[in-house]
Amino acid sequence: MKCNTLKLTEQDQFINKIKNSESQITSFYEYDASQKESFDRRLKTPNNGREFHLSRVIKSYMNELNLTHQQLNNIDALADGAKVVIGGQQAGLFGGPLYTFHKIFSIIILSRQLSEKYDTPIVPVFWIAGEDHDFEEVNHTYAFNNKETTLKKVKYHTMTPPDSNVSRYTPDKNELKASLNHFFKEIKETVHTQDVYQMCVNIINQYDSWTDIFKGLIHEVFKDYGILLIDAQYPELRQMEKPLFKEILEKRDQVDQSFRETQIRTTQQQLPSMIQTETNTHLFIHEDGMRQLLNFDGTYFKLNKTEKRYTKQNLLDIIEREPERISNNVVTRPVVEEWLFNTVAFIGGPSEIKYWAELKGVFDTLNVEMPIVMPRLRITYLYARTKKLLKQYNLSIESVIANGVEQERQRFVREKASNNFINEVEEMKTQQQELYNNLLTYVENNHDNQLLLEKNNQIHLNQYDYLIKRYLLNIERENDISMRQFREISETLHPMGGLQERVWNPLQIMNDFGIDVFSPSTYPPLSYSFDHLIIKH
């Protein structure tokens, strides 16, 4: 496998602005991610004193896994005060979209580069967002069906979706295996299929909760890189977070005000408003089997799904006795994460790093310094067959990844069509319009006849448009093989109108290239980059 960088012309220039240190963007972060001085300064910040306790919690969380010596070494390094590079993601079905793996690679690569450059251990940590409760975001994935050259949605079906954190949810193993069977039914069978399939079955058999199954897959793929894993909803981690939960509750007004004020400043700089929330408390509580948002009405903290209410002291007591019932929303989660870890850099997706720009005031209010915020690597896999098709149709990979193939596909069809035929029909449309204009002069004093004439004219014009449309459709049918190939290019490099990594599932790559495709012995050596990466097989 080989890797090349690619400079895409992107509509969203946010990451390029970070790369170019534009003050419009960098002013909303503590550090300029593109400057070496930022790393020099961040690495000199004193530790928070929680690293040893945190290493014990992570070791406890990962205890049921068969840890590699790389992981054990990193747990020891963390206990000894090593700083971390961290990022997180929801626990998607079968690993979720490819960008989950790419985020983990970003964490691993940046931590390795910093370790080598500064001659000090920097530990890669992946944060599983098990406190999230939006099951519809994680219960499905997509498989590319080669025979039909289309993407197929694969979903875990249940009549009782969870109302609380996904970490609390135990899926039906038979239904999960049915979803797995559906996935492998859609993709082509290769020499690697049985190995990848059996790996997934073993993981489903071994673990019970939704996030533990996800953890098992991530560990299996990335264990040899030394990645450390932690679930945001892990009870022992919640015990550590009690002091900050209490501070967030005590400073509820200041936290909310600082968030709102910073968000206003970002929109004044023509940045999009990323965080949409009406709460003024920015914490959830597990109550009546549901994860419910807290909101202060001036006297009590009320819930968004039931009538129950609390005083501040009620909540402080719950935090002290049962901190696992409390969880963060999008505003407080980043601060809690960085309060726990001695972080050099946080790795986020494009949307994440945008909404972090709205949170600097919250970090300052809670006396937690925002780490360096870095965009994750963006990667596309280029199959040999796809490369051949690009050459066959003289298509630029940069253009296809950014914009798709529809314009080129339509041009191909037009070139196969008869220009004389289309021009004659267009001329007939022009004549029809002229006839309409002439006839209109005879009925200018009769409103009903004007409407009749207008309707009749539109019917004729629509028929001519339909004639051209059906004529071109017949051309497409005559060139069915080429149409399928255009569709294959699109669904591979620009699926659903976006990047491959936002739709395709990692299991598909493993099925095509091997169960060890993401392992250190097979995956190409990468360096951290703001540019788009192309990995060719």
UniProtKB/Swiss-Prot annotation:
Q: Which GO terms describe its molecular function?
A: ligase activity
Query: What Pfam families is this protein classified in?
Result: CC_BshC, Rossmann-like_BshC
Q: Does the keyword Coiled coil apply?
A: yes
| EC number in record | 6.-.-.-
Tell whether Coiled coil is among the UniProt keywords.
yes
List the coiled-coil residues: 415-439
The protein's UniProt keywords, in alphabetical order, are: Coiled coil, Ligase
Root EC class: ligase
The source's domain of life comes to: Bacteria
The record's listing under InterPro entries reads: Bacillithiol_biosynth_BshC, CC_BshC, Rossmann-like_BshC
Q: What does this protein do?
A: Involved in bacillithiol (BSH) biosynthesis. May catalyze the last step of the pathway, the addition of cysteine to glucosamine malate (GlcN-Mal) to generate BSH.
Family (UniProt)? Belongs to the BshC family.
Q: What is this protein called?
A: Putative cysteine ligase BshC
The organism named in the record is Staphylococcus epidermidis (strain ATCC 35984 / DSM 28319 / BCRC 17069 / CCUG 31568 / BM 3577 / RP62A)
